Swiss-Prot record:
Any one Gene Ontology molecular-function term assigned to this protein's record: ATP binding
Entry-linked InterPro entries: Cyt_trans-like, PPAT, Rossmann-like_a/b/a_fold
UniProt-annotated binding residues for ATP: S9, F10, H17, G88, L89, R90, E98, Y122, S123, Y124, L125, S126, S127, S128
Pathway: Cofactor biosynthesis; coenzyme A biosynthesis; CoA from (R)-pantothenate: step 4/5
Assembly, per entry: Homohexamer.
Protein name: Phosphopantetheine adenylyltransferase
Family as reported in the entry's similarity comment: Belongs to the bacterial CoaD family.
Lineage: Bacteria, Bacillati, Actinomycetota, Actinomycetes, Mycobacteriales
Compartments where found: Cytoplasm
Catalysed conversion reaction: (R)-4'-phosphopantetheine + ATP + H(+) = 3'-dephospho-CoA + diphosphate
Residues the record marks as site: Transition state stabilizer: H17
Record keyword Zinc present: no
Protein's gene: coaD
Coiled-coil portions: none
Length: 164
């Protein structure tokens, strides 16, 4: 059985993430989507909320499961017996950063990183950009699963109410 891990913060999951996850799921027997925990960053959504949104958005993919991890991703991949880390690349900036990470991960544990070119439809898309645009009232409904979009708008409204 071949398995891969697709890591990210997924705060929130976008249609670009889902495109990559779906394409990876077609290539591997098992795909573990892993929400990486970074305690130095305060996300818009909790880890549990992100996992819930990812589970809902990937429920049609029987070989995908969702987890979270705090620590070195390669340690998680080794622990779970996953043969590859798969990362979506939007452009050259992503590649420059991810290549160094891939080389370090390979050196540490021998786990390889595979890069998947993002569908051009989503090459501009990032969770950070979606949150920023939505916060200022921009329409991001076609960039997120419908349930995620609803939750994002609700969270933005909650934060606005807290700050007024």
């Amino acid at each position: 059985m071949t398995g891969a891990v697709c890591p990210g913060s997924f705060d929130p999951v976008t249609n670009g993430h889902l495109d990559v996850i779906g394409r990876v799921a077609a290539q591997f027997d098992e795909v573990v989507v892993t929400v990486l925990i970074n305690k130095s960053k305060r996300g818009m959504f909790t880890i549990d909320e992100r996992i819930e949104m990812l589970e809902d958005a990937t429920s049609h993919l029987p070989n995908v499961r969702v987890t979270s991890w705090h620590g070195l991703l390669v340690d998680y991949a080794k622990q779970e017996g996953l043969s590859a880390i798969v990362k979506g690349l939007r452009g050259a900036n992503d590649f420059d950063y991810e290549l160094q990470m891939a080389q370090m991960n390979q050196k540490l544990t021998g786990v390889d990183t595979l890069f998947v070119a993002t569908n051009p439809t989503y090459s501009y898309l990032s969770s950070s950009l979606v949150k920023e645009v939505a916060t200022f009232g921009g329409d991001v409904s076609d960039m997120l699963p419908a349930k995620v979009h609803s939750r994002l708008l609700a969270r933005i409204a909650e934060r606005a109410a807290e700050n007024s």
